[in-house]
A protein has these predicted regions:
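Short linear regulatory motifs enriched in tryptophan with gly/pro/ser
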Residues: 1-186
Length: 186
């Protein structure tokens, strides 16, 4: 079995008043038999959250193109990860949101994925070992669809072995923000 160390970066969230001077991250050690739902729980605890909400993991290729969504078990329907876009919508999105220096190959992959999205995955049924770290460009995680606490996840290390229990935080940087802003301070 493989043990993975993932670095989980928390993106700024200006609508909730979270704009830190320094980057906030947690390094989490997890073995390949753990599910994405268990990885979610580890991230949830690492960032000192207390009110449970829906979440989503998205795999991305080396160009940052979303490949597939893995969702909270109660949201899982096994349908497409997102709704299909028609050619006009895809062209408009590429023109407005895709970087000018994106390769034609990346744009074509985006076009194919958006016109025929893959089925979403169930986070409770998908293990870490199901991902190939050599081909996984990036993984993103959004907690609380609505307040949109967005995270970028990158693989730091792998080693042979297994954990005897739950995933663990092995390093951290920066203070975790409050899950909800204090309205009296705004």
């Amino acid at each position: 079995m493989t043990i993975y160390v993932f670095r989980v970066w928390l993106h700024p969230n200006p609508p909730l008043g979270f704009e830190p001077d320094d980057k906030v991250r947690r390094d989490i050690e997890i073995d390949g038999s753990h599910t994405l739902a268990e990885f979610h729980e580890a991230i949830f605890e690492a960032f000192e959250r207390w009110d449970s909400h829906a979440y989503e993991f998205i795999t991305r290729d080396e160009d940052g193109i979303a490949l597939r969504s893995y969702v909270h078990p109660q949201l899982y329907e096994a349908g497409p990860s997102w709704r299909p876009m028609d050619d006009e919508e895809i062209d408009r999105f590429i023109e407005q949101a895709v970087p000018d220096d994106a390769s034609d190959d990346a744009k074509e992959r985006f076009r194919e994925l958006q016109s025929n999205p893959p089925p979403e995955g169930n986070a409770a049924e998908t293990t870490i070992d199901e991902f190939d770290p050599d081909t996984l460009g990036a993984l993103s995680y959004t907690f609380d669809i609505g307040d949109n606490w967005e995270h970028y996840i990158e693989l730091q290390d792998t080693q042979e072995g297994s954990l005897d229990g739950d995933p663990v935080v092995v390093d951290e940087q920066g203070a975790a923000p409050s899950q909800y802003p204090d309205l009296d301070e705004q």
